[in-house]
């Protein structure tokens, strides 16, 4: 009995010794890892933030904060054009690097971190295999052809008119009075969500006027906080830690996944009843050239989810940013208002085509807003393939990630003089090669945004309609901000601008 009691009393001591030994070995391992990454690692020669050179958790922290795009820019200001932003990652901020990494023929593929985002099956966002991606993109391209986009315009116009009608409540004020302040970020979120839902699924969720489905938009934003962290540090999923750290994001993801599942199911059920084609119908009817296969239900759902998120957010952020900069730049605002109002004699004339394309200053304002406040401003990481790659004159061996911080290169003064100045005229010079060479709000090359043409049409039509109908201004007395700030959580989380509107009266006929 005494021996048993002695063993029981000594057990905690033995456990403590074991834990101490294990902790010592673990500490020694961490110390060795830090020394290796700082001194002996193949990328040790490159400067960068100290914590970033040691651990991916540095980037993950800034992704969680939503300022990773600005932090990459700050690091470039301190360390130069090439920085080691994570132990196995190099970031650049030059036009040459944009071409080297994202241009056609670059010896890179999507980073392995995108595997972390795969849910059921890979989609065009997460596919790493170049051949598979090219095949899927060919299937999807039919839904974004010029002919398809032209056929979608009436639906887009109808929803834009709904937004314009809601910006000023009729009879709420005299013609010459300013409206109540409107936070435009949610308005543009509702508009673009309704547009993409209509164009993809022929669905009418009417978030512009009804609360019911607005929770889906909030769920997307919440879900993307976790996604942005995983893209920087997949290790966060170890022991399912992300489930505890990002419980709200998980709830948002589940809510959005259920929405997509039910929406796709409803869309499939009514396939034979639709008179007009939508993007989903193009996906259903298109087949891969290689084997004649069309997309299955999981693939259709995955692509639809990506399009809803990317298609809604990119355009909403573009619209909000452009309105912000116009409201802060009186001279430019008056010039673009004059351009739009002289170009169109009536609201009915505002359509996609040569007349709208003639509004060159309006288009330049959109491009400049995308330059200053890109919807996704951090780096799109690419893994170097066998044989390595030379980026901006520096050779990077196989297996490491390279990328260009979009916000950082968009604010590089060697490409864009006075980069924090809203200057749409930089896009109106005869030769725009230099400014275009580093411009990548929609990415570049084979991985560029497939819906770029649709997004540009939406932005031009929306802004032209608003400007033709209304004067607008920032709320008097508000603080003047030099830049439209975004939180980079894969997509751009945003607030504002808060604007007031006033109807334009033409020949005693009220517009609005």
UniProtKB/Swiss-Prot annotation:
The stated induction of this gene product is: Expression is positively regulated by the oxaleimides biosynthesis cluster-specific transcription factor poxB.
GO annotations of cellular component type: membrane
Q: What is its main location?
A: membrane
Heme in keyword set: yes
For this UniProt entry, which segments traverse the membrane? 15-35
Membrane topology of this protein: Single-pass membrane protein
Q: What does this protein do?
A: Cytochrome P450 monooxygenase; part of the gene cluster that mediates the biosynthesis of oxaleimides, cytotoxic compounds containing an unusual disubstituted succinimide moiety. The first step of the pathway is provided by the HR-PKS poxF that serves in a new mode of collaborative biosynthesis with the PKS-NRPS poxE, by providing the olefin containing amino acid substrate via the synthesis of an ACP-bound dec-4-enoate.
Any idea what this protein is called? Cytochrome P450 monooxygenase poxM
Q: Which organism is it from?
A: Penicillium oxalicum (strain 114-2 / CGMCC 5302) (Penicillium decumbens)
């Amino acid at each position: 009995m005494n021996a048993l009691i002695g063993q029981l009393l000594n057990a905690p001591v033995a456990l403590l010794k074991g834990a101490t030994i294990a902790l010592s070995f673990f500490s020694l391992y961490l110390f060795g890892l830090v020394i290796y990454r700082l001194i002996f690692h193949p990328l040790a020669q490159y400067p960068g933030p100290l914590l970033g050179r040691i651990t991916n958790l540095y980037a993950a922290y800034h992704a969680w904060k939503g300022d990773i795009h600005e932090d990459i820019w700050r690091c470039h200001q301190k360390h130069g054009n090439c920085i080691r932003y994570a132990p196995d990652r190099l970031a650049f901020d030059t036009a040459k690097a944009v071409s080297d990494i994202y241009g056609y023929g670059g010896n890179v593929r999507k980073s392995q971190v995108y595997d972390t985002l795969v849910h059921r099956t890979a989609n065009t966002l997460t596919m790493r295999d170049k051949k598979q991606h090219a095949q899927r993109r060919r299937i999807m391209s039919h839904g974004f052809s010029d002919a398809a986009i032209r056929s979608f315009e009436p639906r887009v116009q109808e929803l834009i008119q709904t937004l314009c009608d809601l910006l000023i409540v009729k009879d709420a004020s005299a013609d010459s009075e300013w409206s109540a302040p409107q936070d435009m970020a949610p308005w543009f979120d509702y508009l673009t969500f309704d547009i993409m839902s209509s164009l993809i699924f022929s669905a009418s969720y009417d978030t512009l006027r009804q609360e019911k489905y607005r929770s889906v938009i909030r769920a997307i934003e919440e879900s993307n906080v976790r996604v942005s962290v995983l893209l920087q540090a997949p290790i966060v999923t170890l022991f399912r830690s992300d489930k505890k750290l990002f419980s709200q994001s998980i709830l948002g993801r589940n809510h959005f996944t259920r929405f997509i599942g039910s929406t796709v199911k409803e869309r499939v059920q009514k396939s034979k009843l639709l008179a007009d084609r939508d993007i989903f119908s193009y996906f259903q009817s298109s087949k891969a050239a290689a084997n004649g296969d069309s997309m299955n239900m999981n693939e259709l759902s995955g692509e639809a989810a990506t399009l809803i998120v990317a298609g809604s957010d990119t355009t909403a952020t573009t619209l909000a940013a452009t309105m912000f900069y116009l409201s802060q730049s009186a001279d430019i605002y008056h010039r673009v208002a004059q351009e739009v109002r002289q170009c169109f004699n009536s609201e009915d004339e505002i359509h996609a085509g040569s007349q709208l394309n003639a509004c060159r200053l309006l288009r330049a304002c959109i491009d400049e807003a995308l330059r200053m406040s890109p919807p996704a401003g951090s780096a799109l990481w690419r893994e170097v393939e066998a044989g390595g790659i030379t980026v901006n004159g520096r050779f990077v061996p196989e297996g490491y990630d390279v990328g260009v911080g979009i916000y950082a290169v968009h604010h590089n003064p060697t490409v864009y003089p006075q980069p924090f100045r809203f200057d749409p005229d930089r896009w109106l010079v005869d030769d725009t090669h230099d400014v275009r060479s580093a411009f990548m709000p929609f990415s570049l090359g084979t991985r560029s945004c497939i819906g770029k043409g649709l997004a540009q049409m939406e932005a031009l039509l929306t802004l032209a309609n608003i400007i033709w109908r209304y004067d607008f201004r920032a709320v008097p007395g508000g603080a003047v901000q030099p830049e439209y700030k975004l939180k980079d959580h894969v997509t751009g989380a945003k607030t504002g601008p808060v604007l007031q509107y006033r109807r334009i009266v033409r020949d005693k006929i009220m517009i609005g």
